[in-house]
């Protein structure tokens, strides 16, 4: 896939009013502060396309980005962040699960996993949930550049052992762009 245009489309706080134009949706999901917004900026080669923050839980809405005028990248709120109120955390969780369960336009879910902490319970639960919903998913190990070589091998083995149903696993560094071409190649298979 060659991304020639990437623009913020709209944010939604509920499933009401989501686009109904039939474009496929590639959805990015993961724990809070896993690097979803940074990955989107890197993937689209557009710094500032998706708002980033060092504060976990910054993405609180469903954010749509129109890619090449023919599909959407969708940034969902992160899960697993403990420092927001219980009610707000439940609200994000309901928004995320309702979207994944009910949205017919989803072509692929891309689960971002912090390479420094592969195999966390919440990530495993998300994989099980995606399997249960029958959603095809791939995994991106983010922050790959932060690992030493021995840690990279261990992280890869760990995620492979718990992600047998993933369509792909890509190692990614938003900082250097390592893994970008491979991920775009994988996403292209689901962009039609």
Swiss-Prot record:
Gene3D superfamilies: P-loop containing nucleotide triphosphate hydrolases (3.40.50.300). Pfam families: MMR_HSR1. GO terms for biological process: division septum assembly. It comes from the Bacteria. CDD domains: YihA_EngB. PROSITE patterns: G_ENGB (PS51706). One of its GO terms (molecular function) is GTP binding. Mg(2+) binds at residues 37, 59. Its cofactor is Mg(2+). Keywords: Cell cycle, Cell division, GTP-binding, Magnesium, Metal-binding, Nucleotide-binding, Septation. Belongs to the TRAFAC class TrmE-Era-EngA-EngB-Septin-like GTPase superfamily. EngB GTPase family. This is Probable GTP-binding protein EngB.
């Amino acid at each position: 896939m060659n991304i020639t245009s990437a623009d913020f489309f709209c944010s939604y706080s509920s499933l009401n009013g989501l686009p109904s134009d039939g474009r496929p949706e590639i959805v990015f999901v993961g724990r809070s502060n896993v690097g979803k917004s940074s990955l989107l900026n890197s993937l689209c080669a557009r710094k500032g396309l998706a708002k980033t923050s060092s504060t976990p839980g910054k993405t609180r809405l469903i954010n749509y980005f129109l890619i090449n005028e023919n599909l959407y990248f969708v940034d969902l709120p992160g899960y697993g962040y403990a420092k927001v109120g219980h009610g707000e955390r439940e609200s994000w969780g309901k928004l995320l699960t309702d979207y994944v369960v009910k949205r017919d336009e989803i072509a692929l879910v891309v689960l971002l996993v912090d390479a420094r902490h592969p195999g966390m319970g919440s990530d495993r639960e998300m994989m099980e949930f995606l399997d249960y919903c029958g959603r095809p998913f791939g995994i991106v190990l983010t922050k790959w550049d932060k690992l030493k070589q021995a840690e990279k091998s261990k992280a890869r083995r760990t995620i492979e052992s718990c992600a047998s149903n993933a369509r792909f696993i890509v190692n990614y560094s938003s900082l250097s762009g390592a893994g970008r071409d491979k991920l775009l190649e994988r996403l292209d298979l689901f962009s039609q």
